[in-house]
Amino acid sequence: MLIEQFICRKDNFGVLIHDEKSGMTAAIDAPESKAIHNALKRRNWTLHTIFVTHHHHDHVEALAELKQVYNAIVFGPAAEKNKIYHLDQTLQSDEKLLFGSQSLLALSTPGHTLGALSYYFPEKKLLFAGDTLFSLGCGRLFEGTAVQMLNSLKKLCKLPDETLLYCGHEYTKNNALFALTLDPHNQKLQQRAEEVLSLRAKNAMTLPVTLGQEKATNPFLRWNDPAIRKNLSMKDSTDEEVFAEIRKRKDNF
């Protein structure tokens, strides 16, 4: 499977997935028509399918035009069918389906929105997490609760460490600076932050990254880490309390 990643709008990631065996191409979300058109033209691919992660405008704005031009079929969360225009097929929580020759899981990951989905290709170990999980961060809780988001992240953490993570936004630099305030002595985080700053200085993208690397560096996946709990003065707090405090601090960072 081939992947084309590019920047849309200001800081959205556009992602195209091409299944070589079937010749089919899918987009993860539809943030901007022009950038997606250009990427398809660059690779000489035709768009067949769009997988929507959630209903926010910056992820669905180009649906109408892409459907009109390519006659693409749009899949998205059943829980948000009344908020996403142009949906052709709805997906239930943790539904299994096929894209070309590849099996795909639509994982229910509420928190950022109540119906948010993350798409996982188990054979290729590829995760497209939308705005649920970012590199060194996670999505804001616009609709869901801290408990819901924590449970969603725990679900994603069960995937193999070698899984490659793609997400909805290039937020990694700011996330790295925040992560260092909570976990300043984490050498793996220090190395990742240095790498991120170097990449962004060259206007290069910071994803994909392995899930294993995120588990070692992302404070939103490290609610059990003794050093982070000590820095928060929350040694004996619950996972939910620690996660909620980290999210609160990031919101105000």
From Swiss-Prot:
The residue stretches assigned to a coiled coil in this entry are: none
Name the keywords, alphabetized.
Hydrolase, Metal-binding, Zinc
Among the Pfam families in the record, one is HAGH_C
Which superkingdom heads the taxonomic lineage of this protein's source? Bacteria
Q: Per UniProt, what is one GO molecular function of this protein?
A: hydroxyacylglutathione hydrolase activity
- Top EC category: hydrolase
Q: Which cofactor does it need?
A: Zn(2+)
Q: Which InterPro entries match?
A: Clx_II_MBL, Glyoxalase_II_hydrolase, HAGH_C, Hydroxyacylglutathione_Hdrlase, Metallo-B-lactamas, RibonucZ/Hydroxyglut_hydro
Q: Which residues bind Zn(2+) 2?
A: 58-59, 131, 169
Q: Please list the residues that bind Zn(2+) 1.
A: 54, 56, 112, 131
Q: What does the record give as its pathway?
A: Secondary metabolite metabolism; methylglyoxal degradation; (R)-lactate from methylglyoxal: step 2/2
Query: Gene3D superfamilies, from UniProt?
Result: Ribonuclease Z/Hydroxyacylglutathione hydrolase-like
What reaction gets catalysed by this protein? Answer: an S-(2-hydroxyacyl)glutathione + H2O = a 2-hydroxy carboxylate + glutathione + H(+)
The record's remark on the cofactor is: Binds 2 Zn(2+) ions per subunit.
| Listed EC numbers | 3.1.2.6
Record-level GO BP terms: methylglyoxal catabolic process to D-lactate via S-lactoyl-glutathione
Q: What does this protein do?
A: Thiolesterase that catalyzes the hydrolysis of S-D-lactoyl-glutathione to form glutathione and D-lactic acid.
Q: Quaternary structure per UniProt?
A: Monomer.
Q: Which family does the entry's similarity section mention? A: Belongs to the metallo-beta-lactamase superfamily. Glyoxalase II family.
Q: What is this protein called?
A: Hydroxyacylglutathione hydrolase
Q: Which organism is it from?
A: Bartonella tribocorum (strain CIP 105476 / IBS 506)
Traced from the root, the source organism's taxonomic lineage reads: Bacteria, Pseudomonadati, Pseudomonadota, Alphaproteobacteria, Hyphomicrobiales
